[in-house]
Amino acid sequence: MSMAPIVLAAGGTGGHLFPAEALARELLERGHRVVLVTDVRGTAFGDALREVPVHRIRSATLGGGLLGKARTALELGIGTLQARRLLSRLEPAIVVGFGGYPSFPAVYAAAGLRIPVAIHEQNAVMGRANRMLARRARLICTSFPEVQGMDNVDRARAVRTGNPVRPAVLALRDRPYEAPLPGGSLDILVTGGSQGATVFGEIVPRAVAMLPEDLRLRLGIVQQARAENLQAARDGYAALGVQATLAPFFRDLPERLARCHLMIGRAGASTVAELTVAGRPSILVPYPHATDDHQTANARAVAAAGGAWIMPQPEFTAEALAARLTALLTDPAPLAPAAAAAAAWGLPDAARRLADAVLGAAGLGNGRSTPDSQMRAAE
């Protein structure tokens, strides 16, 4: 067991916190001490892993205008001083950052103290915080084979580990995809969260209404929808004779994913990781306002492997979706190969790979090489 702790720096959204939690679990199982440095949004992390001490420091997202940028710089500066004092006391073996501005103070402070640094990038486009920190990192772990925003110097220190998923999703690896039968039902899961529920709530019911009745009645819909739109959506599907289950949030989403023949949703890093680990085909509609359009890059990677179809939001019309659904209802044969391609692309052992890489960079052993340890960087 290492007496020096391994510090994880993550905060903000779940997309940054989920992989940190997965790495923490893996490291704890191997007998290592783990500490989390986070912002106010990540303090609930301790509820999931009570063995992990949680330290909150100041941070901020990038503000607009001169005043906003000045406030961000001030908050990050204060956070860096707090992190420097904390790390000087903890003397960690390595600090691992998971992107986003909440990770910046701890990683930047670690580099200044000459503590080994690793960063994990969840998307196919390197985030702005990770770009600023990349040159200070001994190790860059990526989720995609190709990552935009990296140069050759970064590439030499990069390893594809994948993006760890929740245990409930990982368990789906043992549940093979059951392809729909010709002339049988087609079960569709529609997700989207706060940034997707509105567009999917408008387009999907209209597309279903355009289908011939004999095809429409073969559909089963499970769909996330905003609370204020639930009743109207239920009434609309009922009038069409379509079996539909709608809710603002599904606590059993992994189980819903396991049962579906096709998923329609966004292309965030966590969504892509879960789809590919589960081995489920999808129609991906990238969120058009994502920073640096990273969701389009995410979707293209899976589509290029044959595991998904991309519909950019301007092209995600009721008519276009109806045509796609008609084709799959008429001939579902493409779904099984797409599911297999998604599964082949995914890395179900991402937590193990990430732990191996981090421990190797810290000089703590357990750093086993993996077949996918080489990656390419798209400049």
Swiss-Prot record:
Pathway(s) it belongs to: Cell wall biogenesis; peptidoglycan biosynthesis
Keyword tags: Cell cycle, Cell division, Cell inner membrane, Cell membrane, Cell shape, Cell wall biogenesis/degradation, Glycosyltransferase, Membrane, Peptidoglycan synthesis, Transferase
CDD domains associated with the record: GT28_MurG
Keyword Cell membrane applies: yes
Enzyme class of the recorded protein, top EC level: transferase
Molecular function (Gene Ontology), one example: UDP-N-acetyl-D-glucosamine:N-acetylmuramoyl-L-alanyl-D-glutamyl-meso-2,6-diaminopimelyl-D-alanyl-D-alanine-diphosphoundecaprenol 4-beta-N-acetylglucosaminlytransferase activity
Residues engaged in binding UDP-N-acetyl-alpha-D-glucosamine: T13, G14, G15, N123, R166, S194, Q295
One CC-aspect GO term: plasma membrane
Pfam families named in the record: Glyco_tran_28_C, Glyco_transf_28
Lipid bilayer topology: Peripheral membrane protein
Enzyme Commission number(s) of this protein: 2.4.1.227
Catalytic activity annotation: di-trans,octa-cis-undecaprenyl diphospho-N-acetyl-alpha-D-muramoyl-L-alanyl-D-glutamyl-meso-2,6-diaminopimeloyl-D-alanyl-D-alanine + UDP-N-acetyl-alpha-D-glucosamine = di-trans,octa-cis-undecaprenyl diphospho-[N-acetyl-alpha-D-glucosaminyl-(1->4)]-N-acetyl-alpha-D-muramoyl-L-alanyl-D-glutamyl-meso-2,6-diaminopimeloyl-D-alanyl-D-alanine + UDP + H(+)
Any one GO biological process: lipid glycosylation
Location of the protein in the cell: Cell inner membrane
InterPro entries, per the entry: GlcNAc_MurG, Glyco_trans_28_C, GlycoTrans_28_N
Family: Belongs to the glycosyltransferase 28 family. MurG subfamily.
Biological role stated in the UniProt entry: Cell wall formation. Catalyzes the transfer of a GlcNAc subunit on undecaprenyl-pyrophosphoryl-MurNAc-pentapeptide (lipid intermediate I) to form undecaprenyl-pyrophosphoryl-MurNAc-(pentapeptide)GlcNAc (lipid intermediate II).
Name of this chain's protein: UDP-N-acetylglucosamine--N-acetylmuramyl-(pentapeptide) pyrophosphoryl-undecaprenol N-acetylglucosamine transferase
Species of provenance: Rhodospirillum centenum (strain ATCC 51521 / SW)
Gene that produces this protein: murG
